[in-house]
């Protein structure tokens, strides 16, 4: 027995796909943050440019220091707004001040808070070392691919280490290496 937690947009998309045979062509995006002129929720076609969605929210009230695609804990920073809305898009956050940049990252103090906070019972401290060393084999042995990228470890870290971002990058690296290895194996036959 377990639970499935989904947002309303996903539930509606499932209903429309199953009961009405409608493909997913629109997405509801939340545009918010202290740098957004008129925050709100916007239902936009997939492929719509992020800049167009921000314009629909009245644009920026002032130039943001930080723009994030996704939530505050699991979102990724945006450096360009000329990207399309996809089925995985959920929100655009724009902040006048970067809340993370105000506190400098310091070396890990091995307090173990990230280990305690991890809902998957992983070892973020060791995974981060493997990530910094770009050691994909070690990262996999530490079950780094099981990370759900929830952001809990980064949130509780007193050293303000970008743990979740490091794990996301490392998982992409592992997957890219696996694809390259598979392609090489297929090409060698």
Model-predicted segments: where are they?
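Hydrophobic alpha-helical positions that pack around
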Residues: 1-50, 56-61, 71
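Catalytic cores of large soluble enzymes that bind and process phosphate-bearing ligands
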Residues: 2-10, 23, 41-45, 84, ...
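Short, mixed-charge, low-aromatic patches
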Residues: 6-13, 82-87, 124-126
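Ferredoxin-type iron-sulfur electron-transfer modules in oxidoreductases and energy-metabolism complexes
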Residues: 89-105, 115, 119-189
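Active-site gating/interface segments in enzymes
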Residues: 58-109
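Structured core elements
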Residues: 4, 30, 41-43, 52, ...
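Flexible loop/turn segments at secondary-structure boundaries
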Residues: 37-39, 51-52, 74-77, 100-101, ...
């Amino acid at each position: 027995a377990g639970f499935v937690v989904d947002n309303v947009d996903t539930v509606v998309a499932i209903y429309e796909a199953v009961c009405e045979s409608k493909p997913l062509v629109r997405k509801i995006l939340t545009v918010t943050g202290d740098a957004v002129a008129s925050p709100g929720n916007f239902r936009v076609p997939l492929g719509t440019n992020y800049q167009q969605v921000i314009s629909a929210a009245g644009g920026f009230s002032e130039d943001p220091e930080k723009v994030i695609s996704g939530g505050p804990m699991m979102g990724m920073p945006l450096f360009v707004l000329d990207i399309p809305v996809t089925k995985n898009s959920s929100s655009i956050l724009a902040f006048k001040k970067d809340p993370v940049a105000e506190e400098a990252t310091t070396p890990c103090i091995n307090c173990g808070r990230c280990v305690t906070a991890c809902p998957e019972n992983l070892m973020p401290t060791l995974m981060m070392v493997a990530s910094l060393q770009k050691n994909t084999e070690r990262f996999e042995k530490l079950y780094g691919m099981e990370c759900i990228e929830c952001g809990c470890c980064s949130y509780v870290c007193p050293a303000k280490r970008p743990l979740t971002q490091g794990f996301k990058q490392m998982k992409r690296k592992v997957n890219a290496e696996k694809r390259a290895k598979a392609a090489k194996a297929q090409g060698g036959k």
